[in-house]
A protein has these predicted regions:
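SDR active-site strand-loop-helix element
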Residues: 6, 31, 68-72, 111-117, ...
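Conserved glycine-rich Rossmann-like NAD(P)H-binding loop of the short-chain dehydrogenase/reductase
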Residues: 25-34
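Conserved mid-core alpha-helix of short-chain dehydrogenase/reductase
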Residues: 55, 96-100, 218-221
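Rossmann-fold cofactor-recognition segment
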Residues: 42-52
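N-terminal Rossmann NAD(P)H-binding glycine-rich loop of SDR-like oxidoreductase domains
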Residues: 3-23
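NAD(P)H-binding glycine-rich loop region in Rossmannoid oxidoreductase-like domains
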Residues: 50-90
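Catalytic helix-loop patch of NAD(P)-dependent Rossmann-fold dehydrogenases
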Residues: 82-97, 109-110, 118-166, 173
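NAD(P)-dependent short-chain dehydrogenase/reductase
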Residues: 123-129, 151-212, 216-221
């Protein structure tokens, strides 16, 4: 079986590729942006601009994958406030480009779209634990783009009969995560304090927020 991992240069990509090759025995191709540095000895790595539908169509026709894992995203909530246009372009336009490219294929692969627990937004009292059909109330730009991606997946599935699966994954943690994310940031601060690079104070944001965290290796296994 052939798998195509779109946007494999981030945190989750290497873990997913390792699972697909070592545990599933798949032949894997991974895409990255031109600026990203990504070397893998267990997969073929190719450059792809998710905003260029012509590139996507060409890649899909050449690879003829059985499965597509769409990881390409601007995935920082904080950065989505700083650059909403880029977040919307990558997360929404990029998703539309992929789905429209899949629609043009004779061989229709199964597509996995990665949503976010952020889509649920502000949870009301009595709604926990959250279930899949809980009301979606995006509270930030990143969450809104992921909710839109979810709706686009359903629309393309219903209208064109595409085999699309969607998940709303909650916060991932694990080795090699960048300090852009909260747990990795806390860990980096602790390490810097131990090495004398930072005063013995951990700087935090809103500690009243409640989140579920899942090890990235458990996420890709699921």
């Amino acid at each position: 079986m052939k798998a195509l991992v779109i946007g494999g240069g981030g945190f989750v990509g290497p873990y997913l590729v390792r699972h697909l090759t070592d545990d599933c025995g798949y032949e894997v191709t991974v895409t990255k942006t031109e600026k990203e540095q990504l070397v893998m000895d267990n997969a073929v790595v190719k450059n792809l601009d998710i905003l260029d539908i012509g590139q996507i169509v060409g890649l899909l026709k050449a690879e003829q994958p059985d499965y597509i894992f769409h990881l390409a995203a601007q995935s920082s909530v904080a950065y989505s406030w700083k650059n909403p246009t880029l977040t919307i372009d990558v997360n929404i336009k990029g998703c539309v480009n992929l789905l429209d490219a899949v629609r043009q294929l004779d061989k229709k692969p199964r597509v996995l779209l990665i949503g976010s627990g952020e889509e649920y937004g502000h949870i009301k009292e009595g709604e926990c634990p959250i279930v899949e059909d809980n009301t979606v109330r995006p509270g930030n730009i990143y969450a809104a783009t992921k909710a839109c991606q979810n709706m686009l997946g359903k629309i393309y599935s219903d209208a064109y009969g595409l085999d699309i699966m969607m998940v709303r994954a909650f916060n991932h943690i694990g080795p090699n995560q960048t300090p852009m994310f909260v747990v990795a940031d806390f860990c980096k601060q602790v390490a810097d304090i131990e090495k004398g690079r930072q005063e013995p104070v951990i700087y935090v944001g809103n500690l009243s927020a409640k989140r579920d965290f899942t090890d990235v290796r458990d996420v890709v296994n699921a």
